[in-house]
From Swiss-Prot:
Keywords: Cytoplasm, Methyltransferase, RNA-binding, rRNA processing, S-adenosyl-L-methionine, Transferase. It comes from Shouchella clausii (strain KSM-K16). GO terms for cellular component: cytosol. Its main location: cytoplasm. SUPFAM superfamilies: S-adenosyl-L-methionine-dependent methyltransferases. Specifically dimethylates two adjacent adenosines (A1518 and A1519) in the loop of a conserved hairpin near the 3'-end of 16S rRNA in the 30S particle. May play a critical role in biogenesis of 30S subunits. Belongs to the class I-like SAM-binding methyltransferase superfamily. rRNA adenine N(6)-methyltransferase family. RsmA subfamily. It catalyses: adenosine(1518)/adenosine(1519) in 16S rRNA + 4 S-adenosyl-L-methionine = N(6)-dimethyladenosine(1518)/N(6)-dimethyladenosine(1519) in 16S rRNA + 4 S-adenosyl-L-homocysteine + 4 H(+). This is Ribosomal RNA small subunit methyltransferase A. The lineage of its organism: Bacteria, Bacillati, Bacillota, Bacilli, Bacillales. GO terms for molecular function: 16S rRNA (adenine(1518)-N(6)/adenine(1519)-N(6))-dimethyltransferase activity; RNA binding. S-adenosyl-L-methionine binds at residues 31, 33, 58, 79, 104, 129.
Amino acid sequence: MNLNKDIATPARTNAILKKHGFTLKKSLGQNFLIDLNILAKIVEASGFDEQDGIVEIGPGIGALTEQLAKKADKVVAFEIDGRLIPVLEDTLSAYPNVKIIHSDVLKADLPGVLDAEFSKGQAIHVVANLPYYVTTPILMKLLEDRLPFKSITVMIQAEVAERIAAKPGSKEYGALSIAAQYYAEAKPMVVVPASVFVPQPRVDSSVLKLTIREKPLVEVIDERWFFNVFHASFANRRKTILNNLVHNLAGKDAKAAIEQALSEAGIDPKRRGETLSPQEFARLSDALYSTLRKAD
């Protein structure tokens, strides 16, 4: 493959940036990896096979892309910063199995790209070092659009990874935990110190693996309503589940109907949202869906 030295070293990274006169944009959360051991752990954590396809988001100068291209059948990478396209074309020129797309992945036609770039029936995984500022929107788009990914392995802010994988009753548990775990099994894999990036971010990162479920974690009457219910339940963590639902879901006039739904779901109205499991939220969502519709 590539006869050049690996991209993810301090010397090579600096040489690439200097060669192309590239300056980092803070607004795009650009932090480049300079540790090959961490890259190896990301690739290992993702668990893809050599015949699989990879979607990468935010390839930067190609450090992770290069390692993915060595082991996967094909890598399709979305880069929002047009200044990086010629850099990537240079650093990844030895890898014919890499396709760079200049696009914001949040606005891209992902189904169309997957159909065009990968073989029918080919297993596809997402592997990415995501910018902190756009982590949640990207992850939720990938999950909510129900694209045919087997897994999503991402390096993200450690605190966000903990929130996504959190269990009921923990201080990290919240709406993001339920939203992500509804679609996927979440497992933190590797803690990554800030020192392996150029420039160094202010916080540590974590590699998180989301293994997509064949069917959602819980079954509900109305999925959008379910999401509305648990989001409302976490609006104010100091309030009880009853107060949060009254103030953030249906209004004071619906208090009696909400109390009835809580009773039907077997949930104490004095509990707080962070103590409810996804299964309890599913029961509550269905009960609220029925009682509030009757009250209308």
